[in-house]
Amino acid sequence: MTFTIGVDIGGSSATAVAIDETGDVVDRYRVNGRIEGGRQVVASALAAIRSFQLDECVAIGIGVPGLVDSDTGQVTMAVNLGIGPRPFPLAAEIEEALDFPVVIENDVRAAALGAHESLRLIGDMPDSLAMVSIGTGISAGVVLRGELLRGTHGMAGEIGHIVVDESAALCRCGQRGCLEVVASGPAIARAWPQGPEGNAATALFAAAVGGDPAAEKVAGRIAGYLTTALTWLAAAYDTDRIIISGGVSDAGDTFLSAIRARINRQAAVSDLAARRLRPEQVTLALRDDPPGPRGAAVLAARSLPTHSLPTRRVSPARTQATNAK
């Protein structure tokens, strides 16, 4: 049995899965530890990959934040990982250490492909899909007819820097009122400081459902900003499905209900809006099958000359966690 490995690099962990020819996740590992700078990105990825028995591995895929050139294997502007405008040769570093072919992709785009593949393997075949990650930042990945949309400059899906409120604060990108400034995890924490640290979105939307007038106002404003972005995605790409992931999505059904209520409000006054985006098209990412590492593994498989799509799905294997040195 041969398999590919997919790795998802985050600011505090690297999660890896091994996927066989059928699409089954045969094993998975997570390496915990703060990741800061290109050297630590490489070290964390290698630690996760070396957790597997590599005798049957044929290729490796890595999803990483920032601007990714999948042709050269280089990463820039992965700010949360300490990688700036100078290109970092991530793929070459991993290839040199392990002697396997390596492909890299933006983490949210890899997650979009992973989500699309998971649906395909259970017989759900969306023609197009968008994955929207809402956490420290906001970004999207789009899959059209089974293929990732990257864009001319590798910036497709950077919706965090769509201006949605020109009266809001200045963004680090230089614009005022970007979506990321008003609706990301840190933005919600600033708008609702009553919530516990790291869990402001859950506290906010729960308070709004509970009838707190101040929470209702803040939650409504944030849901409005996010619905504007989702509507833009639906209009631009005519997506069958929009899946929300990231830390803010941990707020769960109360958060999703607020988004769907906004979509319903638009549909009530416009037949075009009702056709463009329906509430049931927007869902939250599944927790039991992380799409990021799966998508990276799929990209690794697609890079092989003999690649063919798997036709069945078996339940994921166990999760193991180790601590980074």
Located regions from the model:
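Conserved A3 ("GATE") glycine/threonine-rich loop of ANL adenylate-forming enzymes
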Residues: 13, 108-110, 135-139
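A short acidic/small-residue loop/turn micro-motif
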Residues: 33-34, 83, 156-158
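ATP-dependent carbohydrate kinase catalytic cores
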Residues: 101-115, 130
